[in-house]
Amino acid sequence: MEPIKNLPRLCRTLSYEFKNIELLTQALTHRSAANKHNERLEFLGDSILSIVISDALYHQFPKATEGDLSRMRATLVRGDTLTIIAQEFKLGDYLYLGPGELKSGGFRRESILADAVEAIIGAVYLDSDLEVCRALLLKWYAERLAEIQPGISQKDAKTLLQEHLQGFKKPLPDYQVINIEGDAHDQTFTVECRIEDLSQSVIGVASSRRKAEQIAAAQVLELLKK
């Protein structure tokens, strides 16, 4: 298997340092690229993500019904959410794809990106243990868990924008951090959102990258409605 570049940078982005880097390499390898691909790791990661998020929601919402807990979990672990997480990690830059998938833009394909997130979760579990994996996932999901509430619509602006573009078979939005100001504990992020249908770029500014992306996505949705 050919080496994948910049894995140390990806580890920093993921906030996890692999002891066995081959596990990360395998997690990033699509079945079109090699016999030793990421599907088994994806199977494992899917189960781990489900139990960690289920446990977090159970304790966070002691009065929520089973139905509300199920709907919130579905929102947090569904493919659209995993695709957005993959985009936040810029996983498309690190995927190992076969020539056909590479040529057809597989590094942008939602299902491939979502599967890679689950595979990385499986790889982290094998490289460490369930508690380390749980702590990492809760860090990845901290803002989403803080924002989610039972009994209300669970779709945020980024998800709604993504679904809108998918409905018209358009490419996914591109989010880029164009400026970070302030000290480490008090930063302001400026994020640019670009989509194929708009010639102009849209800017979101907030105290975290994800919040800035949500603001930019909401503004794009408003422009698309006009």
Curated annotation (Swiss-Prot):
Q: Where does Mg(2+) bind?
A: E42, D115, E118
Family annotation (Gene3D superfamilies): 3.30.160.20, Ribonuclease III domain
Q: State if Hydrolase is listed as a keyword.
A: yes
Q: Where is the active site?
A: D46, E118
- SUPFAM superfamilies on file: dsRNA-binding domain-like (SSF54768), RNase III domain-like (SSF69065)
Q: What class of enzyme is it?
A: hydrolase
Q: Which source organism?
A: Shewanella baltica (strain OS155 / ATCC BAA-1091)
InterPro entries in UniProt: dsRBD_dom, RNase_III, RNase_III_dom, RNase_III_sf
- What's this chain's function? Digests double-stranded RNA. Involved in the processing of primary rRNA transcript to yield the immediate precursors to the large and small rRNAs (23S and 16S). Processes some mRNAs, and tRNAs when they are encoded in the rRNA operon. Processes pre-crRNA and tracrRNA of type II CRISPR loci if present in the organism.
Gene Ontology molecular function: double-stranded RNA binding; metal ion binding; ribonuclease III activity; rRNA binding
- Please provide, in alphabetical order, the Gene Ontology terms of the cellular component aspect for this entry: cytoplasm
The record's listing under PROSITE patterns reads: DS_RBD (PS50137), RNASE_3_1 (PS00517), RNASE_3_2 (PS50142)
Q: Identify the taxonomic lineage of the organism of origin.
A: Bacteria, Pseudomonadati, Pseudomonadota, Gammaproteobacteria, Alteromonadales
Q: What is its EC number?
A: 3.1.26.3
Q: What is this protein called?
A: Ribonuclease 3
Name of encoding gene: rnc
Q: Which UniProt keywords apply?
A: Cytoplasm, Endonuclease, Hydrolase, Magnesium, Metal-binding, mRNA processing, Nuclease, RNA-binding, rRNA processing, rRNA-binding, tRNA processing
